[in-house]
Amino acid sequence: MNNKIGFTLLFLFGFVLGLILLTNDARAQQPASGSKPAQPSATAQNPEGPYTITSSIEFGVRGIAIDGNADIYRSQLNYTPGFRIFDASLFMQSKDNDAPVFDSLMISSFGWGNDPNRHLRVNAEKTKAYRFDANYRRFDYFNSLTNIALGQHRSNTEYRQGDFDLTILPQNQRAKFYLGYSLNRNSGPAVSTIRFNGDEYPAAYPVRAASDEYRVGADARVSVFDISFMQGWRFFKDDTEYLITVPHPGNNPTNTAKINDFFRSAPTRGETPFTRLSVHTLINRRLDFTGRYIYTSGTTRYTFFQNGTGTDSSNNKVNSDIITQNGGSKRPYGMGDVAATFFVTDRFRISETFRVNNFRINGADLLSEVLLRSRVTAGGETTLPPVLTNTLAFRTIKYRRFLNLIEADLDISRWLSVHAGYRYTDRHVEVGFDDISIGTPAGPEVETFDNRTNTFIFGFKAKPVKIWSLYFDLERGESDNVFTRVDNYDFTNVRVRSILRPNRTLSFNASVVTKDNANPSVTEDNRAFGVNVKGRVFTSSVDWSPSQKWSASGGYTHSRVTSDAEIILAFSGSPSTPGQSRYFSRDNFFFVNGFCQLSSRAQLFAGYRFHKDPGQGNRLSTQKLLIGSFKYESQAPEAKFVLKVNKNVDWIAGYQYVAYQEQFPKGDFYRAHLPYTSLRISFGRPE
């Protein structure tokens, strides 16, 4: 109730303030009787300073009223009530490109205050000297959804990301230089689960992760070659911990395991230097050649410490269970490719690309565990023999992949062009692993895997009539996956797109995308054990802009995904039996937007969005067939009114409504009302 009263008062305050400003502006436009016409000021006629400046700021309040599950609302939208700066911008342009520090400066931002997404952008340039580009973003990530994890996987963290790039001599065609820096931070409270003594327990999970990247590079023109070089260094760290400070019986109430306290820490450090070199040239306007080489060498190190006390599943008292671990890995990676395009004629082109990927991952760690337990009986407490574990583990992955792609493009006429190609890959993978218990002989094992894929590509662009464009793309073949060594994916991807423009104000867009993906595999007992996924996306939209005073657009998208996986069903007391798991997604999305210039001072924007996924429909699971889907429905109408109070001030009032409903017997829902009002103050904009 307090939230509803609060946002209502704030909304009325903004409305009244806008009317007051409108009244004052109307009075100011009425000349006093007998007064002389105002003379133009000298400042307006002869503006001083080296820059032309345009700026604006929009500030106001947002109200929130939520009915239903507030955690789902925060996990999806996370807007909060109160004051905020919706957006702000500043643009400075030198009048003669001869300003002392910069010739142009643009600063823009939105969302600062209480919005979950905030962005700041800065662009500055001094002609022929430098160009600076900066982007800084902050995201509030809240996740607290009802799921099979009993609501014990939650987070309320903040992401901070930034990219800062400086280009020296940006207009110089012979040489230019680059400096860059990027940051990524994630921190905040979270809850996760841990396994201990045969049961599962919720644990505090404070997230602390960060990465920094530094870059330096140059572009140069040497004779007929364009050369580009980049050297970078990326550093990463993660200091996330798991904490349990109060006793907990565990999620399984049928066993005797419980925990008294628990601590886990695994600080991780990583660094990845990377190098990129590329060369490009055009020979006699017939042969376009590009060569590129990338090399990285990533290193990761970590230390692990864990200790917990409680009771295990055998009703033994766990006095201490200390696990320490130290390890690291290294991943040198190299990728080189060369590509050439030969212009046989003005209408016919042949392209050839050859690429080599090669990497190796070497890692090892040493694990030590000391488990101290005792048994409490009627006769007292008996100390059990300690359990000591010392294991040394090694892992090695070697990966090499060749790729060759040949393509041809033919422009048959102004109305028709055709594209065809063939892609071939050859992959070799070696996996080595060795787990050594201290005091026992080693038994290293190595697995080797080789495979090849073939893919055919075809497409065309047609213009049957002047107002109609038609696009078609087809890919059919096999695809490998570096982390899946069972078999190739058999896939067929088709895309058709149509654009119809009867005139300059009206356009119709329609497209169809189909993706058939099969991952066949056979286990050692000759049992089929694969996955088939079929996806279909139908999209259509209409855009109509008959004049600058009003416009409308709308569209409909239907996305359907069906997956069919062979699985093994294991029931307590019964032998494992083969089964199937099928998942259905049938998402329908509709939207409509409109704009109307009500008068020279007033504008109205309105829109409506609707989502519905009926999922599996009336299909039901059987003993050997598991059927799943996620049924939901959501709608979001919104409207915004903009009133130009005077040359420098706009009053804005808007309203958004979001309704979300999960279509389950006990499905969660929420309904959110989000009114807002704001003032936009501008300087330097035209009448």
Descriptions of predicted regions:
Residues 1-12:
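Bacterial N-terminal signal peptides that target proteins for export
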Residues 30-49, 53, 63-687:
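Gram-negative and organellar
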Residues 10-20:
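Bacterial N-terminal signal peptides
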Residues 26-28:
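Boundary at the C-terminal end of the N-terminal hydrophobic targeting segment
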